[in-house]
C-alpha cells in the first residue's frame, strides 16, 4: 500500500517547518512520517499501540535518528502539563481521539503551536474505511478552536492487488472489507485521498 508519504512529508514541511523545534508527535506509531523528524531538534513520538511503536523504533533505527527521536507509549490526555513543546503534531490521529475537542484543548496546554494533519470528510478513502463521520467531527473541533492557517491537498492510496487492499482494511471489519472489494471491482486499485493541514495557536489553559 502506498499513499505517497514522501509527498505528504514535503507538503507538511512546506506548511510548517520543524527546524530546530522540540516536537510532540501524536499517533506516531508505525513511523510513516519519520522523514519529517529529520529537521527537528527533538521528537517525542507518542502512540498507545506497543506494536506500532516497535515499527516506529525500527524505522528510526534505519534512518539513524535514535538520538533525536524518543518513542513513548501513552495517552495524550494523561501527559503531565509540565512538559512543554514548540509544536505538537497530530499525525492523521485526531479523528481517532474519543473527543477531538478535549484532545485539542490538552494539546494547546503542551505546545506553542498545534499542527493537525488528517483526512478530509470529502475524501473517498475516508468514506471507504468508514471514518467520514469521525473525520468530520475532528475538523469541527479544529474550527471551533479557530485555525490560524488551513490548507487542503489531494493524493491517492495505491495498491498492487485487490488482496493487498483487503489485507490493509481487514482490521476495520467485514463491512469495510465489502466496501473495498466493491471499490476494487468497479474503480480499480487507486483510491483518491483528500487531506488537510491546520495550524492552531497553543500554550493556553483552555
Q: Residue locations for each model-derived region?
A:
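A short SAM/SAH-binding and catalytic strip from SAM-dependent methyltransferases
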Residues: 87-99
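Conserved Class I S-adenosyl-L-methionine
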Residues: 30, 137-206
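A short acidic, Gly/Pro-enriched loop at the edge of an enzyme's catalytic core
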Residues: 77-87
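Class I SAM-dependent methyltransferase SAM/SAH-binding core
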Residues: 24, 29-78
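Conserved alpha-helix/loop element of class I SAM-dependent methyltransferases that forms part
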Residues: 2-21
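Conserved class I S-adenosyl-L-methionine
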Residues: 115-141
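A short glycine-rich, Lys/Arg-flanked "PGG" loop and its adjoining helix->strand segment in the class I
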Residues: 101-114
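Conserved acidic residues
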Residues: 21, 41, 86, 112
Amino acid at each position: 500500500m502506498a499513499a505517497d508519504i514522501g509527498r505528504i512529508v514535503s507538503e507538511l514541511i512546506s506548511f510548517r517547518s520543524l527546524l530546530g523545534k522540540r516536537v510532540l508527535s501524536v499517533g506516531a506509531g508505525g513511523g510513516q512520517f519519520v522523514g519529517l523528524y529529520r529537521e527537528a531538534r527533538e521528537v517525542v513520538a507518542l502512540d498507545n499501540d506497543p506494536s506500532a511503536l516497535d515499527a516506529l523504533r525500527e524505522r528510526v533505527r534505519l534512518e539513524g535518528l535514535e538520538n533525536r527521536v524518543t518513542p513513548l507509549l501513552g495517552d495524550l490526555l494523561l501527559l503531565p502539563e509540565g512538559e512543554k513543546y514548540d509544536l505538537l503534531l497530530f499525525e492523521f490521529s485526531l479523528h481517532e481521539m474519543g473527543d477531538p475537542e478535549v484532545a485539542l484543548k490538552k494539546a494547546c496546554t503542551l505546545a506553542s503551536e498545534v499542527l493537525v494533519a488528517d483526512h478530509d470528510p470529502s475524501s473517498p478513502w475516508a468514506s471507504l474505511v468508514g471514518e467520514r463521520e469521525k473525520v468530520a467531527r475532528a475538523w469541527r473541533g479544529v474550527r471551533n478552536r479557530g485555525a490560524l492557517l488551513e490548507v487542503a491537498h489531494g493524493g491517492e492510496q495505491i495498491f498492487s492487488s485487490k488482496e493487498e487492499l483487503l489485507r490493509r482494511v481487514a482490521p476495520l471489519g467485514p463491512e469495510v472489507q465489502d466496501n473495498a472489494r466493491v471499490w476494487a471491482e468497479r474503480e480499480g486499485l487507486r483510491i483518491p485521498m483528500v487531506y488537510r493541514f491546520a495550524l492552531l495557536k497553543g500554550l493556553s489553559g483552555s
